């Protein structure tokens, strides 16, 4: 049976699977206590990992490709506005495809886990892309499997491997247009954060390589530098992303009305709705419709045939956990 690609495609149609379609109707999820916890934990982690200005400046020296489109608002971003910042989703916004899938490839190559585990997570991602919504039972199953694989592994080990995997699989997948938008904010003296369901340490590697300020990502617990196999809250997805941005903005004394956010997914509408300058980047059908209805800015850096993204929860909520096996779920919640 052919494996799905990083974009969730395969040689056979997953819709032939026997499904119970009643639960597939999309539902907007409100913020829960766990999503608030996940957001606050991610914001705290992001602030800690971003407090290394010399390292960030060194990473920021990377050559940047000019923007592919002229900004629609020449006066934006506003130079010198210390209370403004920009928040970028990762998968299919900053980079093409699912970052965690590629981290998984790198760990599988290093015999970090078995082929059957890679196959299982790949099919889970494809399934959720086709389904177009989330099911608590399936998410819980993937979560437990992913966390069981990283349990007992050292954070430093997986961070080191993640650096190598970035060079092997991710560096060439960055959208130059989105990268230029991020650089415009940096050049204006603003801070720029990735906001992703990917593990926060994985996201931090990518942010550092791109010269960004830091990253908000899914937070997993570690004790003594070793993963415990538990998450702090829930994956940073949907409402949890909005909570993370809200918490970080409060801690950093940012004015969200002066901030910008960028995403490809309708699942990030809560985050996009928080800021004064929301942008739909390479948008899926639902986000494109919402953006047009609300007069949001759109950018599309895809060329040729546009990839149809049906079930973003796979790449974000569930895919982050599946890839979290691959890349190692991130940050440390130390216990006494």
Task: Tell where the protein language model's regions lie, with residue ranges.
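C-terminal cap/substrate-recognition subdomain and adjoining C-terminal extension
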Residues: 1-77, 81-83, 160, 167-336
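Active-site neighborhood of HAD-like aspartate-dependent phosphohydrolases
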Residues: 60, 71-131
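Residue-level signal for pocket-adjacent positions within structured domains
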Residues: 89, 144-145, 215, 226
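A metal-dependent, Asp-based hydrolase signature
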Residues: 99-100, 112-184
